[in-house]
Amino acid sequence: MKKSITTLDLNLLLCLQLLMQERSVTKAAKRINVTPSAVSKSLAKLRAWFDDPLFVNSPLGLSPTPLMVSMEQNLAEWMQMSNLLLDKPHHQTPRGLKFELAAESPLMMIMLNALSKQIYQRYPQATIKLRNWDYDSLDAITRGEVDIGFSGRESHPRSRELLSSLPLAIDYEVLFSDVPCVWLRKDHPALHQTWNLDTFLRYPHISICWEQSDTWALDNVLQELGRERTIAMSLPEFEQSLFMAAQPDNLLLATAPRYCQYYNQLHQLPLVALPLPFDESQQKKLEVPFTLLWHKRNSHNPKIVWLRETIKNLYASMA
């Protein structure tokens, strides 16, 4: 028989979401500042109400049951709606508005000043929180911790970062596509040699650790050719790789999106950009569609719609 929500303590649903996120009774307890015993008792009540174990112990922590997995999206949406309801008194005026974004650092830095001006012009008391895009950012959008993400995806058929691989709950719009370039200092010895694949692979490379991986579509293309680059340094951000490639007497090559030219101009880095030495079909596999990402529940949220349109217009003016 269907149970009434009036028989459930709604605080238990917060505990359930934290258990799903943390996969640990102890970690969930720390999040809400209670004892692990209290969380265990809450889990026991939830198991009785749903008539399901919800989680089972595994070597990696709590593993959700099929029922729990099926409820995850609904639970996240319920929590998001609850937060919006509780924040309603603070969001009746612009004073309460908060804009939370996750983006690749140089991608956002080249337009953050212009974006913040437009936000403050419309919402003078708003606050802006910007975080770097990382492996957890899509989950942060799902959890309601990020309004909009702005990140590059990949085009190589074997990539895990294809647009077609995005979670069903995520909506997106491609703002522009970019093909990465090779960035090297203006007096690099490679500039005095024929620019081809052999020259490209002759020198050590800086790699970007992207969503917990040191390799990307470039390495897939090289593997298809039976070749491999020497990765001498791995860094978390494109701007760090450009900074290192620009250092005097440095033989390192950085591969970064063409849009980084705006970043180089801002910081006057002594770098030259060369095309990746591949044919047209290989270049196509390296295309990076830079994409706005948001949760479907926010598709008609006036704040998110306005933010999306503002970012789109800013990048259109740069094209």
UniProtKB/Swiss-Prot annotation:
Gene3D superfamilies: Periplasmic binding protein-like II, Winged helix-like DNA-binding domain superfamily/Winged helix DNA-binding domain
Top-rank taxon: Bacteria
DNA-binding region: 25-44
This protein's record includes keyword Transcription: yes
Pfam families reported for this sequence: HTH_1, LysR_substrate
Domain called HTH lysR-type: residue spans: 8-65
MF GO annotations: DNA binding; DNA-binding transcription factor activity
GO biological process terms on file: DNA-templated transcription; regulation of DNA-templated transcription
Record-linked CDD domains: PBP2_Nitroaromatics_like
Keywords for this protein: DNA-binding, Transcription, Transcription regulation
HAMAP family assigned: HTH_type_YidZ (MF_01607)
NCBIfam families per record: PRK10216.1
Function of the protein: Involved in anaerobic NO protection.
Homology family: Belongs to the LysR transcriptional regulatory family.
Record protein name field: HTH-type transcriptional regulator YidZ
